[in-house]
């Protein structure tokens, strides 16, 4: 199974990049970050035309994630358990059957958090990581094959 993570920075503005990705790498699953589109405006038909099923969780102007796949997933989760409708759309998960095995793929657009002293952004980053850790611990009890991918917004130095 070929799996690709791609920060597209506006899915409606870059269908040509998805076509190029399909033609050069031919992934089975593409995890997209920064779709920057509300769900009702997501380009479902355009994605279908290039050969992919789409699951998405977005909001206008920023954030937003999607999972594009050649085969429809068995199960999809949008956001973490306990997220409110006002939470940023940063996490999507899909479970696929692949060669008689179940594979759960988590795709996130992780908050960058500014710096540790930022009063709102850094706590949101910590909450996202805590939610993800708790989610993975819960999944590990029943799932064998887990993949976490996305734009982690982490750099080892200030040169990002």
Explain the meaning of each model-derived region.
Residues 29, 50-51, 128-160:
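Metal-dependent phosphoesterases centered on the DNase I-like endonuclease/exonuclease/phosphatase
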Residues 35-36, 42-117:
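Structured beta-strand-rich core segments of catalytic domains in phosphoester-bond hydrolases
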Residues 3, 73-75, 146:
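Hydrophobic anchor at the start of a short beta-strand
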Residues 1-10, 102-115, 149:
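Active-site-proximal beta-strand elements of phosphoester/diester hydrolases
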Residues 1-52, 57, 62-65, 156:
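N-terminal, active-site-proximal structural segment of metallo-dependent hydrolase catalytic domains
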Residues 10-14, 86, 124-131:
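Soluble or luminal CAZymes and related metallo-dependent hydrolases
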Residues 20-22, 90-100, 131-144:
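Short amphipathic alpha-helices and their capping/turn segments at secondary-structure boundaries
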Residues 116-121, 157-160:
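A short secondary-structure junction signal
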């Amino acid at each position: 199974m070929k799996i690709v993570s791609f920060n597209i920075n506006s899915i409606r503005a870059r269908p040509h990049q998805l076509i190029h990705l399909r033609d050069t790498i031919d992934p089975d699953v593409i995890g997209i970050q920064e779709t920057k589109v509300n769900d009702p405006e997501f380009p479902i038909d355009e994605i279908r035309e290039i050969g992919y099923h789409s699951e998405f969780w977005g909001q206008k102007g920023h954030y937003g994630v999607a999972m594009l796949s050649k085969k429809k997933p068995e199960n999809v989760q949008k956001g973490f358990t306990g997220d409110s409708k006002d939470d940023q759309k940063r996490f999507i998960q899909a479970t696929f059957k692949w060669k008689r095995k179940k594979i759960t793929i988590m795709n996130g657009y992780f908050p960058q958090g500014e710096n540790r002293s930022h009063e709102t952004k850094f706590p949101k980053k910590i909450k996202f990581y805590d939610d993800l850790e708790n989610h993975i611990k819960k999944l590990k009890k029943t799932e064998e094959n887990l993949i976490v991918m996305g734009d982690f917004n982490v750099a080892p130095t200030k040169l990002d």
